[in-house]
Structure formats: C-alpha cells, structure tokens
Amino acid sequence: MININGEIKVDNAAPFVLFGGINVLESRDLAMRSCEEYVRVTGKLGIPYVFKASFDKANRSSIHSYRGPGLEEGLRIFEDVKKTFGVPLITDVHEPYQAKIAAEVIDVLQLPAFLARQTDLVVALAQTGRVINIKKPQFLSPPQMLNIVEKFREAGNDKLILCDRGTCFGYDNLVVDMLGFGVMKKVTGNLPIIFDVTHALQQRDSLGTASGGRREQVADLARAGMGVGLAGLFLEAHPDPKVAKCDGPSALPLDKLEPFLAQLKQLDDLVKSFAPLDIEA
C-alpha cells in the first residue's frame, strides 16, 4: 500500500484512485478547466484523485509536433493547479536533472515507458523520495518489471506504483494482457497496479507523424481492467479531442467523464466486495 501525501491510499484492494487529466499542458486555461471538471466529478462520486499532465512530450513521433511548455513554465502551471484545487500532481520526467526540480512541486513522479530501463534516470527519481509511477514498457513482459522495481529498491525507494499501458502486438498495435496485472502483483510483492487505459488505445504512427487511437473503445477496455481488481486508473480526457495537441484520438471527451467514471466506480465496488478465491497453481 502506498500513501500519497498521507491522504490518498493506493492499494490493489482499496477503492480505485484516478490519475487523470490531460496529455500535455497545452495552456494554463486548459489545465485549470480540465482539473475543475475532474475535481467536480471525482468529488461527486467519491473517487480519490490525482491530476496528471506532461510539461514536455519528449518522445513525439515528429520533430514538428507540439511538446509542451517545458519544465519551468510547466511547473508554474502545476503550482497554480495545486493552489487552486488542492489536488496531488503527477507528471513524467525524462532526464535525470529534471527529477529533483520537479519533485519540489510534483507529488508523484513518473518514469516513462520508453525510458524505464535507463538506470541513471531511475536512480535520480528514486533519490527524490517521491512516490514513483513506473510505466511498463510496451516491449517488456510483466515478469521483467521486477528488474526495474529492484533498481528503485536498491536506490532506496520502495514507494512504487506500476502502470500497464499495453504491449506491442505486431506493428503499430497494442493489446492489454489482463493476466499480466496479476503477474506483476505476484512478482513484485503486490505493489499497486494501475491501468493506463487511454494510451493502451493508441495505434502507433497510424496517422503518419502522430499516433492514432480508438477512443470509442475506452469504456470496454476500462471495464475489463477494473474487473481484475486494480489500485487505480490512468486516464486522459480533453474538452475537444479532435483539436488536442497530442493523443487526441485516444482521449475521452471531457463531457463523458462523469458517466464513464460512474460505471467504473460501481464495477470497482462490486469486484472488491468479493471474497478472495485462493486457487492453487
């Protein structure tokens, strides 16, 4: 079980936590408007909430694609969000020097999937003492996540969350292995597992210089994940996905947030009301 700021409990057996927001900080106004809606909906439904966004999308398909405001301006926007809404924050860090700076504002630091084996970055993140969200690389099997976890533990940080965002299935496609959630729980000693449902809907480079997506299937995939019994959901929404500057094809329309989360809350409550079934291998 992981605590965020002593307030939010992240545990596979506890009510799910929403790590939700926008893909990238397009503007201060978008961050504030989006967070306001997330706070309203999660407050109404009783869902613990952490706001997410990126200050830099350093791994865009094209050099011409929008990356974000950068570290300095991004942290100013994050500070405004935290001051206004009082919610914890999560963002991804791409270079070791950014970790300590981001940790001054950010509550949960994220290790990107494409960088999850970069030892210098792992050590820098671990040394901040912050809670760390480790994205499972699309190219790694669930048992291989233990190697990354052990790097963090050796570097002195066991405040870890694991996040699955799908696995490569041939070229330009991702699938989610629902059995993999349980495998990661088992090999890591039951670390909290969260599910990045919107990135799992990506279709890599299907638009040439940007990733496509299948947002019309987000509810199906999210319900399947919640049925396994997870610590949380990682979600991106946008007021108008068609004009989003990054990953719009995978984003949930923001006006669908309340009915979407209401279904998942009911399902999560039901699944976690069941007595565990211990079935020997």
From Swiss-Prot:
Its EC number is 2.5.1.55. Gene3D superfamilies: Aldolase class I (3.20.20.70). Pathway: Carbohydrate biosynthesis; 3-deoxy-D-manno-octulosonate biosynthesis; 3-deoxy-D-manno-octulosonate from D-ribulose 5-phosphate: step 2/3; Bacterial outer membrane biogenesis; lipopolysaccharide biosynthesis. SUPFAM superfamilies: Aldolase (SSF51569). It holds the Pfam family DAHP_synth_1. It is an enzyme of class 2 (transferase). It comes from the Bacteria. It is found in: Cytoplasm. Keywords: Cytoplasm, Lipopolysaccharide biosynthesis, Transferase. GO terms for molecular function: 3-deoxy-8-phosphooctulonate synthase activity. GO terms for biological process: keto-3-deoxy-D-manno-octulosonic acid biosynthetic process. It catalyses: D-arabinose 5-phosphate + phosphoenolpyruvate + H2O = 3-deoxy-alpha-D-manno-2-octulosonate-8-phosphate + phosphate. InterPro entries: Aldolase_TIM, DAHP1/KDSA, KDO8P_synthase. One of its GO terms (cellular component) is cytoplasm. The keyword Cell division does not apply. Belongs to the KdsA family. This is 2-dehydro-3-deoxyphosphooctonate aldolase. It comes from Janthinobacterium sp. (strain Marseille). The gene is kdsA.
